[in-house]
């Protein structure tokens, strides 16, 4: 213990001498140190999810050795950091003294890359210093058994390891081999070497449970090896040692992998130094306290090693630097930290089970673990502001008992209701917004300070803007002070809401006056608790020179930096600067108004073009419809003419048939009159014959005979003529019916066509009227838009006039200077935003740099460099790769806008405070409701000037220096490689380079992408994030959509026509089927009527006594038929029968004159007639009966024949016109004639069932 006390006093003395040297050198190096300590801070957002990879230009070489006070803790030392290289060089002598005590230990080879602090490389003294500390480190490592947790998943995620001092454990591992150290087994070490990354529990309760187990396991080991640790441990001056990484296994495994620097990289980039509040607190702990490796300081990502103390078991030496250059950066937002905390699921349970199962006999005291999480809870609000009560608690913390382990409060896991969650989100969001604004203003101030320093290197004639820059810095300081005060109030308010969170771990150490420098180093470690590590470096750096008396003095010392005392400030200069700034702001506003005027005029021109195009389209469509309507009307007229012609043809057919019938009737009437005259003459002569004398009787008889023959001939001729006339009439009726039906079908078809054409003409008329109405509505809409744009144009002109008047009044009648270069038109793309963010990663979107700069007007000291073309190409390819994720977010962000390039950069002027100078008189043109329909028509004109804009940007790219080109390239590499990690969690790749932090994301409608789009009036210069490629892609998509719409309309029209044709065919087919069905129905009805007629007919006679029905076969043998019927033809000489004919005498009763006369009858199947002659010579034909007219042949059983010569031999032949009564000479002859005649009775259909 005495030796420990002596070592502590010697360390304090050394720290005092180092701080004196630091004060001397700080005035010379402060401007450069601040810029170089600021630049590593840029990596915090883009490196926190660094994926596994190895490349040059790595960013995690953080080996910064500093002197620190030794902690009496047996297994750990406190960490003291120094912001200057002077401390490191001054600590060489002290470390050399320590090396003498441990010279007996084997040396350790130094393989890590040279560390740097703020960009300064280390010299030989620093290497010696490293070697001494490494030797001391290996000495202590050789005396205790290391412990390493092993997990394959942890190993795949991290490269962070820690050693544990457990007895009987035969494993070895490197002490936090994150970058420089590779674990190697040395001579005599165990052949088994296991190492693994610590895992994080998935909940705070699990953390406490594991810490309890860790305490219970390690407490006996502490008491057992306390003496060797106090004897062998040496002073460590490593800033990022294992002691600054407490409880790594309990809190995260989602750390960026750390790799060894390449050989050709002599001075890699470094992150800003970080220490911990717990480190300063542990500097005052005694031996009774828990090792600082288990007492977490203040953050999610502080980890610790259990191998900080000494151990008698030596198993391995760490090759290279056994210390840690930590790249643990603060999560960009609490949401990301929450993801990291929840990343570990079950691996920690496995590790804890194996850990506790390995040595169950060792355990900690159960009351100790409550020290682990207290400090972390106190800083859940996201900022570390120290007031008097905090400092007092720090001084008295060594005597204060530790609080009992309690349930975690004021965290996201303790929120149960939706209202609480929304309130928590609102507070966190407001706090992060304040932090971003403070970071932006501080960065702006530091850039202005750097430009001030650059002004002193110029001649006196060039120092025109020094006063303006000083005024800028003053205004930025005021803004910073306001934001810091509001931030401090929010922190106090959160502490009042959660009183338990105010119980901090500051009580664990006393903060005396001599420890102010140590308190400043503590601020560097806790800088992640301040807003994104932006201002706490400067806050706590000022505390190393000025002890804080109160929170107000603390903020004032922070804001009023010593850099502002470089130039003198006078009221005249400030007034002139304000006037110059007002004039510059007015010139910028004039440029914006002129650009808006140009845009409005272009939009009015586009609307006029659209109106003309709409009018031309209307005329074209109306002309097309009119032509189609005319063609349909012409076809309709033709069909009507054809229909009239068909009707006339039907009428003429009827007239012709009636005329033919009339002619035949007239002819028949004439023949009838002639026959009647002959009959009258015959009757007169017959009367004269009865009255004439006997002498003239013979002559009169001869004359009467001649008249009788003539009467018979004429009667026969009249009957034939009458029959022919009847046949002709029936034939005419049949022809008339056929022709009429055909014509009627044609008439019906043409009528349907006429109806369809009338409907089509009506539809065309309706379509034409609808198109006219639609065109009228579009015209009214265009007129309304044009009027709105004209009103906006008038307002802009009025604003321009007012601005010119104001400028003239300020300048004494002078007008605005003419600068044609300020009227360049361009598109703000995502690449240009990325280029501007390459120089300032955490700038908010409202402070992005312009891509075009006027080199002739812009001052060289205030010129803002942009990214190099290679970085632009990389970002463009990156955007193409992520188009699927972002396409839905930027579809509304494709309007072109103007970019103004003022003579002085507006982003660092006091008039604008880094914001856009767009006037808020009206909404941006891209957001105007009246400009919504201009987008598709204006897309075609957007790509004309793309080549000239690329050349213009290429000219400005040549103005950048080599050092300024390396930073964006590095950011592009780190952002592109981080996409692998982000895509694995299914996050849309924001690249962490286009924006500061997405602090507006409780849901997607509140994210930065939607906030940066055109949703506020002052985003006209930064709202659009689309480049020329996206505009061309949008134009192509619009063309494809238009073509698809046209194709769909055409296909729909074709489908409608096909459906209409199908319906017409179906209708026609149905009509044909219906007509056929009607015909079938009518025929069936006729058949049914015939059957019913046979059944219902009151038959006046029975079935005729014939056994056969008519025979119509051509090869019919009449003779054989009669013989087959049973008749003996040879014995009946009254009848002569052949194969086709049958002849014989029969007595026939006359038709009109009921006289019985003997006639020679001939039945001829060849002629198909049954004719009778006067005698057997067949010279004088008396009458003809056609087979078609013969209906029935039957025996006269009713005795209807009047005055029949022999009623027993009388039979009847029934025809259509009359009934012929005949008397056969014998019964056999009667039966033969009846059977013969019935074979020709083709009109015999009543019994044809």
Swiss-Prot record:
Modified residues (Phosphoserine): 71, 73, 156, 203, 241, 244, 329, 333, 347, 380, 383, 389, 411, 416, 465, 486, 510
Pfam entry (one): PH
Domain annotation PH: ranges: 1139-1242
GO biological process, one term: negative regulation of wound healing, spreading of epidermal cells
Composition-biased stretches (Low complexity): 267-283
Biased composition (Polar residues): 74-84, 231-248, 901-919
Coiled coil regions in record: 580-692, 718-803, 1028-1094
Transmembrane segments: none
Subunit structure, interactors included: Interacts with FLNC. Interacts with AMOTL2; interaction may facilitate PHLDB2 localization to the myotube podosome cortex that surrounds the core. Part of a cortical microtubule stabilization complex (CMSC) composed of KANK1, PPFIA1, PPFIBP1, ERC1/ELKS, PHLDB2/LL5beta, CLASPs, KIF21A and possibly additional interactors; within CMSCs KANK1 and PHLDB2/LL5beta appear to be the core components for targeting of microtubule-binding proteins KIF21A and CLASPs, whereas PPFIA1, PPFIBP1 and ERC1/ELKS serve as scaffolds for protein clustering.
Protein's UniProt name: Pleckstrin homology-like domain family B member 2
């Amino acid at each position: 213990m005495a030796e420990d006390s002596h070592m502590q006093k010697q360390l304090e003395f050394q720290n005092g001498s180092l701080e004196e040297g630091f004060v001397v050198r700080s005035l010379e190096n402060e401007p450069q140190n601040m810029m170089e300590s600021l630049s590593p801070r840029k990596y915090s957002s883009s490196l926190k999810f660094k994926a596994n990879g190895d490349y040059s230009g790595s960013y995690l070489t953080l080996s910064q050795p500093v002197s620190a006070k030794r902690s009496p803790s047996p297994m750990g030392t406190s960490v003291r950091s120094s912001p200057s290289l002077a401390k490191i060089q001054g600590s060489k002598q002290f470390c050399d003294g320590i090396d003498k005590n441990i010279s007996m230990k084997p040396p350790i080879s130094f393989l890590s890359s040279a560390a740097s602090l703020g960009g300064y490389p280390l010299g030989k003294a620093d290497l010696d210093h490293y070697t001494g500390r490494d030797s001391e480190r290996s000495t202590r490592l050789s005396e205790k058994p290391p412990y390493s947790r092993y997990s394959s998943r942890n190993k795949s995620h991290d490269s962070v390891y820690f050693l544990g001092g457990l007895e009987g454990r035969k494993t070895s591992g490197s002490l936090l081999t994150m970058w420089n150290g590779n674990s190697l087994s040395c001579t005599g070490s165990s052949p088994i070497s296991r190492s693994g990354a610590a895992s994080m529990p998935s909940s705070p309760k699990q953390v406490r449970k594991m810490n309890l187990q860790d305490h219970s396991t390690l407490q006996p080991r502490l008491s057992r090896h306390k003496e060797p640790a106090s004897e062998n441990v040496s002073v460590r001056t490593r800033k990022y040692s294992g002691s600054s990484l407490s409880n790594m296994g309990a809190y995260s495994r989602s750390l960026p992998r750390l790799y060894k620097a390449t050989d050709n990289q002599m001075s890699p980039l470094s992150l800003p130094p970080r220490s911990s509040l717990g480190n300063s607190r542990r500097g005052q702990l005694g031996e009774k306290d828990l090792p600082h490796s288990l007492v977490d300081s203040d953050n999610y990502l502080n980890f610790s090693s259990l191998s900080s103390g000494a151990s008698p078991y030596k198993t391995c030496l760490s090759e290279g630097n056994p210390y840690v250059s930590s790249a643990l950066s603060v999560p960009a937002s609490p949401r990301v930290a929450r993801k990291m905390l929840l990343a570990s699921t079950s691996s920690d349970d496995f590790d804890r089970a194996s850990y506790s199962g390995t040595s169950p006999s060792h355990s900690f005291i159960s009351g100790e673990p409550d020290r682990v999480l207290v400090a972390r809870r106190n800083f859940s609000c996201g900022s570390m502001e120290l007031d008097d009560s905090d400092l007092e608690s720090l001084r008295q913390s060594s005597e204060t008992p530790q609080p009992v382990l309690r349930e975690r409060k004021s965290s996201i896991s303790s929120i149960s209701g939706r209202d609480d969650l929304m309130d928590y989100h609102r507070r966190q969001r407001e706090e992060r917004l304040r932090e971003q604004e403070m970071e932006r203003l501080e960065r702006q101030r530091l850039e202005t300070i750097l430009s001030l320093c650059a002004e002193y290197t110029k001649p006196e004639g060039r120092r025109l803007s020094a006063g303006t820059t000083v005024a800028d810095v003053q205004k930025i300081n005021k803004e910073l002070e306001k934001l810091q005060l509001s931030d401090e109030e929010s922190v106090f308010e959160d502490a009042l809401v959660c009183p338990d969170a105010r119980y901090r771990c500051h009580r664990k150490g006393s903060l005396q006056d001599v420890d102010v420098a140590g308190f400043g180093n503590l601020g560097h470690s806790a800088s992640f608790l301040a807003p994104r590590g932006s201002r706490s470096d400067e806050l706590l750096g000022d505390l190393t020179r000025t002890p804080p008396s109160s929170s107000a003095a603390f903020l004032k010392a922070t804001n009023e930096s010593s850099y502002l005392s470089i130039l003198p400030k006078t009221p005249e200069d400030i007034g002139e600067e304000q006037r110059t700034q007002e004039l510059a702001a007015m010139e910028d506003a004039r440029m914006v108004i002129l650009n808006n005027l140009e845009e409005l005029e272009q939009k009015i021109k586009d609307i006029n073009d659209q109106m003309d195009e709409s009018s031309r389209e209307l005329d074209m469509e109306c002309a097309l419809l009119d032509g189609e309507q005319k063609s349909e009307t012409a076809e309709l007229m033709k069909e009507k003419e054809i229909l009239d012609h068909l009707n006339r043809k039907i009428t003429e057919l009827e007239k012709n048939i009636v005329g033919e019938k009339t002619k035949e009737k007239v002819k028949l009437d004439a023949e009838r009159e002639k026959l009647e005259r002959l009959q009258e003459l015959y009757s007169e002569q017959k009367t004269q014959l009865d009255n004439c004398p006997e002498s003239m009787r013979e002559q009169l008889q001869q004359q009467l005979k001649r008249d009788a023959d003539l009467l018979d001939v004429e009667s026969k001729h009249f009957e034939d003529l009458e029959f022919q006339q009847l046949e002709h009439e029936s034939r005419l009726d049949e022809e008339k019916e056929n022709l009429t039906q055909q014509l009627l079908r044609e008439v019906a078809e043409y009528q349907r066509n006429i109806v369809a054409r009338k409907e089509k003409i009506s539809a065309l008329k309706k379509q034409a009227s609808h198109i006219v109405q639609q065109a009228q509505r579009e015209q009214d809409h265009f007129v309304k838009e044009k009027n709105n744009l004209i009103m906006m144009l008038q307002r802009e002109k009025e604003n321009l006039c007012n601005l010119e008047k104001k400028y003239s009044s300020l300048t004494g009648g002078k007008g605005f200077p003419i600068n044609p270069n300020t009227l360049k038109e361009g598109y703000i793309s995502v690449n240009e935003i990325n280029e501007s963010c390459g120089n300032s990663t955490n700038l908010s979107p409202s402070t992005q740099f312009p891509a075009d700069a006027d080199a002739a007007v812009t001052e060289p000291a205030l010129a803002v460099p942009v990214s190099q073309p290679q970085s632009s190409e990389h970002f463009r390819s990156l955007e193409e790769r992520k188009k699927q994720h972002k396409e839905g977010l930027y579809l509304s962000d494709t309007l072109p806008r103007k970019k103004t390039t003022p003579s002085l950069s507006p982003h660092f002027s006091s008039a604008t405070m880094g914001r856009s100078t767009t006037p808020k008189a009206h909404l941006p043109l891209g957001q105007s409701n009246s400009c919504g329909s201009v987008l598709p028509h204006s897309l075609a004109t957007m790509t004309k000037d793309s080549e000239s804009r690329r050349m213009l940007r290429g000219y400005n790219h040549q103005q950048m220096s080599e050092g300024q080109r390396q930073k964006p390239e590095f950011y592009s590499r780190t952002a592109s490689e981080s996409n692998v990690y982000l895509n694995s969690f299914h996050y849309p790749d924001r690249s962490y380079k286009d924006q500061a932090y997405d602090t507006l994301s409780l849901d997607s409608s509140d994210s930065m992408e939607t906030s940066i789009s055109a949703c506020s009036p002052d985003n006209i210069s930064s709202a659009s994030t689309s480049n020329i490629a996206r505009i061309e892609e949008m134009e192509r998509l619009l063309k494809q959509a238009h073509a698809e719409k046209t194709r769909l309309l055409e296909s729909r029209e074709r489908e409608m026509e096909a459906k209409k044709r199908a319906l017409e065919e179906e209708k026609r087919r149905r009509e044909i089927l219906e007509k056929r069905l009607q015909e079938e129905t009518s025929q069936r009805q006729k058949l049914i009527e015939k059957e019913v007629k046979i059944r219902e007919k009151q038959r006046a006679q029975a079935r005729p006594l014939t056994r056969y029905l008519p025979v119509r076969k051509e090869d019919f043998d009449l003779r054989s038929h009669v013989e087959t019927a049973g008749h003996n033809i040879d014995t009946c000489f009254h009848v002569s029968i052949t194969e086709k004919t049958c002849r014989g005498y029969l007595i026939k009763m006359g038709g009109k004159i009921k006289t019985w006369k003997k006639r020679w009858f001939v039945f001829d199947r060849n002629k198909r007639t049954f004719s009778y002659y006067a005698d057997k010579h067949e010279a004088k034909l008396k009458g003809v009966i056609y087979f078609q007219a013969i209906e029935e042949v039957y025996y006269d059983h009713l005795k209807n024949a009047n005055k029949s010569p022999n009623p027993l031999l009388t039979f009847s032949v029934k025809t259509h016109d009359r009934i012929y009564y005949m008397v056969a000479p014998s019964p056999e002859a009667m039966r033969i004639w009846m059977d013969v005649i019935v074979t020709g009775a083709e009109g015999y259909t009543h019994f044809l069932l």
